[in-house]
Amino acid sequence: MSSKIKFVALLIVVISLLLNNAQSTREILSAEICGWNDPAVHCKTKEDCFEKCGGRPAKKVFCVRPGDHSYDRLCCCRA
């Protein structure tokens, strides 16, 4: 009985982590959060975005593709 409870608890934790990861990915790719209404800054690495992002910590600066079919990468500055 206790092994079933442990298994269910572990399953709940794993599912919640997967859902949280998917939500974070959608948030990063959101044009509203990334500020793509501003002039777009093309990048190859996140280091290319530090100046555009105005000294934000490295964990809030991204170089991402704005869409599934885009080959260009743009700077994304999270608040």
Swiss-Prot record:
Pfam families: AtDEF-like (PF25052). Keywords: Antimicrobial, Disulfide bond, Fungicide, Plant defense, Secreted, Signal. Residues 1-24 form the signal peptide. Disulfide bonds join C34-C77, C43-C63, C49-C75, C53-C76. It is found in: Secreted. GO terms for biological process: defense response to fungus; killing of cells of another organism. It comes from the Eukaryota. GO terms for cellular component: extracellular region. Belongs to the DEFL family. This is Defensin-like protein 272. It comes from Arabidopsis thaliana (Mouse-ear cress). The lineage of its organism: Eukaryota, Viridiplantae, Streptophyta, Embryophyta, Tracheophyta.
